[in-house]
Structure formats: structure tokens, C-alpha cells
Design a protein with these regions (language model features):
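Gly/Pro/Ser/Thr-rich low-complexity, intrinsically disordered segments predominantly at protein N-termini
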Residues: 1-198
Length: 198
């Protein structure tokens, strides 16, 4: 009997704890950020949940900066390249490692880039590969981000996601060498050696 009571209590906790998880709206999130309470805390908003971001390792930091600089030079006058800054989506405000967005950059003085401003996003992954390929990919596809690249540092490859169908990317291609073009700028060839840093 005691065991059944304990089981009942645990089941009650499970059901009720699940039901009271708070979902933050974008407006509430902005108020929280503006209040200063999150100052210095490595967190982002994903699907209404405040999620802790992984510390940035040396290889990740170097790759992120190198790739951003390369793309900034390559797309000068064509697109604005942002690194490690927020984007505003529906119920999410993640901080992708690199976002290639529309010009002019001055339009982001009053708001972060929206989905319609984004050409494509890049995540540099080492310890965050599971999160980038299982969690963030859902958010990006559901919000209509047309193209999502993941630089897999551990396996030295680029994983490109395109063609959204039913809130997911239906086309996934892996690259290890050569050149590639974003579907937004088919005339500009990107050297994979510059992304994977061979």
C-alpha cells in the first residue's frame, strides 16, 4: 500500500511538474534581457524555453572568427555577416554562430534580424553537435530559415540543410572538400578549406 501511495505521488509530481513549465514569449524575453537579470549569463531562448549555451572552446572560437572574417570579405556589399548575435524568431531568440542576413546593416539598429531577413545560418559544432542537429534545426526549419549549415569540427565536414517540407529540411548533403555556393548567392563560390580550416 505504501509503495502504491509513493508511486501515486511520483506520478502526480510528474504530471503536474510537466504542466507548469513556463513558456516565455519574445516580449517577455526582451523585458527579461532589458532588466539586466541575465547579464553575463550564457543563455538563449529556444521554443519558449531559456536554454544554457555551452562555453566556447578554443577551436570553436578560432573557427567562428576565421569563417566570419572570410565570409565578410567574400560577401562585402552583398550581405551582412553577423557572428554570435541574436536573431528573433517565433518564440525563440537563439544566437547562431554566424548569420548571413540582408543589407543594410542599419536596419538591425532597432531589432535583431527576423526570419525574412536571413539568407542562411551557420553553427560551428564540436560539443554542441547534438543540440545543433536535433534541437536548433527544428526551430530554424519551423521558422522558414531557407538554409542551415553545420560545421562539424570533430569530423571535419560541412552539413548543409535545405528544402523545407513539413517544418523540416528534406535535403541534407555533407561536404568535405571543394567549393560550395549558397542557394541565395549561386554565383559566389565558397572554399570549403576556408570553412573547415584544413
Amino acid at each position: 500500500m505504501i509503495d502504491k501511495i509513493k508511486e501515486g505521488r511520483e506520478e502526480y509530481k510528474r504530471i503536474h511538474m510537466t504542466s507548469i513549465i513556463y513558456q516565455w514569449s519574445i516580449e517577455e524575453w526582451h523585458e527579461l534581457v532589458d532588466s539586466g537579470l541575465l547579464e553575463g549569463k550564457p543563455v538563449e531562448l529556444l521554443e519558449g524555453n531559456i536554454v544554457e549555451m555551452s562555453p566556447e572552446g578554443i577551436e570553436h572560437s578560432y573557427t567562428n572568427q576565421s569563417v566570419s572574417d572570410y565570409l565578410r570579405d567574400l560577401f562585402k556589399g552583398q550581405a551582412h555577416v553577423r557572428d554570435a548575435h541574436p536573431i528573433t524568431l517565433d518564440n525563440s531568440e537563439p544566437e547562431p554562430d554566424i548569420a548571413i542576413v540582408q543589407l543594410p546593416a542599419t536596419i538591425y539598429r532597432n531589432h535583431h534580424p527576423y526570419a525574412q531577413n536571413i539568407y542562411w545560418l551557420i553553427e560551428v559544432s564540436n560539443r554542441t553537435l547534438t543540440k545543433d542537429l536535433e534541437q536548433k534545426i527544428i526551430t530554424y526549419a519551423r521558422n522558414g530559415i531557407p538554409e542551415y549549415w553545420v560545421i562539424d569540427l570533430k569530423n571535419k565536414k560541412l552539413i548543409v540543410h535545405t528544402q523545407i517540407q513539413n517544418n523540416s529540411y528534406s535535403k541534407v548533403i555533407e561536404y568535405r572538400s571543394g567549393t560550395i555556393a549558397s542557394q541565395a548567392f549561386t554565383q559566389i563560390q565558397i572554399d570549403l578549406d576556408k570553412l573547415l580550416l584544413y
